[in-house]
Amino acid sequence: MFADGKNQESTSESVNGWYAIYLWGLARGDARVRDLGRLMTSLEIRAAWSYWQMTNGESNFPAPFSNNKAVGIQWSTKVDYATWFGGNVEFIHCIQVPKQIQVQKVTLSMNPLQLSSDAPIHPDI
């Protein structure tokens, strides 16, 4: 356990995990599993929009996070503008992109590369 509690760095794994459960339920004809997967996928996507990808004027976090339009790692007690493997801008924004499947088109309502180029990056975060 870390001093700042549990953490999550990338939304792509959780979205894809729940989407896989939806597909599994669909393939097996199990409506309960399918519906659970669909619900949890939509909740994860909403969380990604609310807590990882920020649009102008919409943020759960103060500047400089809102200025950068992204959060790298969310902890139980804090947020970081970094990843486990580095603090490069492209790492922080593009960690949300890795597994490009159909559901990711919905999750990435904003282009992380465009957000990065629009954001006044603060390296001291």
Q: What feature does the model see in each segment?
A:
Residues 2-10:
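Catalytic cores of eukaryotic secretory-pathway lumenal/extracellular enzymes that build
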Residues 9-23:
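Well-ordered alpha-helical segments within folded domains of soluble proteins
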